[in-house]
């Protein structure tokens, strides 16, 4: 009998069935087990079963040991520009810029009060037939102008109220020798003398002084004191502020 390769599975299956039937028959007749048959060939794999139910959650694993830090990577491409940040603190002042061109003239301002604030002027005369006493202060008793009241006729002294540069001048009539001395706060500044004998003559002098507030100026005579003040022969003392400080 010629057996090909394709009939081997069928032949093996038949032999297996024959071996299974032989013991059953021998047991029924004699009561003894037969010799076990040879194991059959493995069957074909069965179909996959259904998925089982999820198992319980496992225990946390052991933390892994940190690995060694790798080398620095290559520089990446520049990113997109970010949003503008908040304003920082003010920086230090910069260097002065180049002066700009001159602007057009502005409107005239209001008239100032310079003249009202800084004025000092007086003119007084000596109207008496009696000359001053020797080596004494000369009092001028008649006021021609004294709007600020800086000259006091009771004391014969000018008192500075506005600091600045002043000019003082006098014209004295006399018929005998006369020397006029100008004092500043007790210190003699200048002396003017005129000499005559029984004739009317005029002695004049002037001086510029820079005064501070509270300083005083007056005229005096020495041993030559023949100053008169009569109609037609006046003696005048004047002073005024030129430039305030």
Swiss-Prot record:
Q: Where is the C1q domain?
A: 115-245
Classify the main location: secreted
GO cellular component assignments: blood microparticle; collagen trimer; collagen-containing extracellular matrix; complement component C1 complex; complement component C1q complex; extracellular region; extracellular space; extrinsic component of postsynaptic membrane
Question: What's the impact of mutating residue 129 to A?
Answer: Has no effect on binding to IgM
Glycosylated residues: list them. 75
Tell me where in or outside the cell this protein is found: Secreted; Cell surface
Signal peptide: which range, if any? Answer: 1-28
Pfam families for this protein: C1q, Collagen
Q: Which InterPro entries has this protein been placed in?
A: C1q_dom, Collagen, Collagen/C1q_domain, Tumour_necrosis_fac-like_dom
Q: What is the effect of changing residue 198 to E?
A: Decreases binding to IgM
* Residues bearing the modification 4-hydroxyproline: 36, 39, 42, 45, 54, 63, 81, 93, 96, 99, 105
Query: What happens to this protein after translation, modification-wise?
Result: O-linked glycans consist of Glc-Gal disaccharides bound to the oxygen atom of post-translationally added hydroxyl groups.
Its activity is regulated as follows: The C1Q subcomplex is inhibited by sulfated molecules, such as triterpenoid sulfates, heparan sulfate, or chondroitin sulfates.
Q: Which region ranges are annotated with the description Disordered?
A: 45-113
> What would changing residue 86 to A do, according to UniProt?
In LysC58; impaired ability to associate with C1R and C1S
User: Which parts of the sequence carry 5-hydroxylysine?
Assistant: 75
Pro residues bias locations:
90-99
**Record-annotated Collagen-like domain positions:** 31-112
Q: Which UniProt keyword terms apply here? A: Collagen, Complement pathway, Disease variant, Disulfide bond, Glycoprotein, Hydroxylation, Immunity, Innate immunity, Repeat, Secreted, Signal
The intrachain disulfides are 179-193
The task this protein performs is described as: Core component of the complement C1 complex, a multiprotein complex that initiates the classical pathway of the complement system, a cascade of proteins that leads to phagocytosis and breakdown of pathogens and signaling that strengthens the adaptive immune system.
Q: How does it assemble?
A: Core component of the complement C1 complex, a calcium-dependent complex composed of 1 molecule of the C1Q subcomplex, 2 molecules of C1R and 2 molecules of C1S. The C1Q subcomplex is composed 18 subunits: 3 chains of C1QA, C1QB, and C1QC trimerize to form 6 collagen-like triple helices connected to six globular ligand-recognition modules (C1q domain).
Domain comment? The C1q domain is the ligand-recognition domain, which specifically recognizes and binds the Fc regions of IgG or IgM immunoglobulins. The collagen-like domain interacts with C1R and C1S proenzymes.
Q: Associated disorder, per UniProt? A: C1q deficiency 3: An autosomal recessive disorder caused by impaired activation of the complement classical pathway. It generally leads to severe immune complex disease characterized by recurrent skin lesions, chronic infections, an increased risk of systemic lupus erythematosus, and glomerulonephritis.
* Name of the protein in its database record: Complement C1q subcomponent subunit C
């Amino acid at each position: 009998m010629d057996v090909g390769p394709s009939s081997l599975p069928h032949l093996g299956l038949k032999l297996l069935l024959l071996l299974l039937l032989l013991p059953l028959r021998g047991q029924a007749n004699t009561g003894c087990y037969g010799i076990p048959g040879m194991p059959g060939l493995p069957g074909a794999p069965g179909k996959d079963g259904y998925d089982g139910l999820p198992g319980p959650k496992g225990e946390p694993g052991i933390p892994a040991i940190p690995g060694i830090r790798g080398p620095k990577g290559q520089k990446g491409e520049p990113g997109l520009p970010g949003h503008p940040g908040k304003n920082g603190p003010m920086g230090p002042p910069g260097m002065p810029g180049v002066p700009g061109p001159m602007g057009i003239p502005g409107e005239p301002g209001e008239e100032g009060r310079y003249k009202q604030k800084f004025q000092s002027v007086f003119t007084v005369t000596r109207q008496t037939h009696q000359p001053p006493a020797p080596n004494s202060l000369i009092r001028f008793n008649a006021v021609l102008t004294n709007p600020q009241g800086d000259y006091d006729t009771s004391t014969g002294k000018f008192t500075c109220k506005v600091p600045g540069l002043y000019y003082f001048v006098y014209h004295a009539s006399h018929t005998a020798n006369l020397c006029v001395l100008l004092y500043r706060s007790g210190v003699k500044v200048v002396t003017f003398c005129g000499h005559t004998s029984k004739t009317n003559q005029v002695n004049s002098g002037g001086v510029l002084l820079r005064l501070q507030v509270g300083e005083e100026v007056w005229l005096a005579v020495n041993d030559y004191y023949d100053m008169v003040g009569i109609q037609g022969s006046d003696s005048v003392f004047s002073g005024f502020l030129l430039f305030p400080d």
